[in-house]
Design a protein with these regions (language model features):
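Glycine-rich phosphate-binding P-loop
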Residues: 4-33
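A short local loop/turn or secondary-structure capping micro-motif enriched for an aromatic residue
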Residues: 18, 58-59, 126-128
Length: 175
């Protein structure tokens, strides 16, 4: 998917909702690159580029609807032939017994053709708006590429506030 100019590779088990989320993103103006089978090549600059095979290009399988042609249904602006892969989002089933990164400080990567791509695992459950989460992840990646890391900046502010509070408490104890 091309989400806000960021090439997003969606991963997850069958039936997790990847195609439905992609369809919702297309309806919001984002673009399909490939569904189900993404072919990937590594460029000489260690960039990854993904595309769909000619056989399934511009097509998507949606449970209950069957195979649909995104280009015919939504127009040429809803698809693109290839896109650099810049972010991997793995949709996983929500499990209350598991601990999930709530701050966004865990930086994971997903290796593709020996290139390390930033990875986020997004827990999904009924009622979660997965396409909005994907869009926010792409927006956050855009900020990170520009040097703005919200989670790190928050952690730094929190660390400073705690250090200041300890310093004030120490001064109060000394006086």
């Amino acid at each position: 998917m091309d989400v806000l100019g960021i090439g997003v590779l969606l991963l997850g088990k069958s039936g997790i909702g990847k195609s439905e989320a992609a369809l919702d993103l297309i309806m919001r103006g984002h673009r399909l690159v490939a569904d189900d089978l993404v072919e990937v090549r590594r460029t000489s600059g260690n960039l990854l580029v993904g595309w769909a095979s000619e056989l399934i290009k511009h097509h998507m399988e949606v449970r209950g609807l069957g195979i649909i042609n995104i280009k015919d249904m939504f127009g040429v602006a809803a698809v693109r032939d290839e896109k650099r892969i810049e972010l991997v989002l793995e949709l996983i089933r929500w499990d209350q017994s598991e601990t999930h990164d709530r701050l966004g400080l865990d930086e994971m990567v997903y290796p593709i053709l020996e290139v390390q791509v930033p990875l986020l695992r997004i827990p999904v459950s009924p009622g979660r708006n997965v396409s909005s989460l994907i869009e926010v992840a792409a927006r956050n990646r855009l900020l990170q590429v520009r040097g703005h890391h919200s989670a790190r900046e928050f952690q730094e502010r929190l660390d400073r506030a705690l250090a200041d509070a300890r310093e004030r408490r120490w001064r109060d104890d000394v006086e």
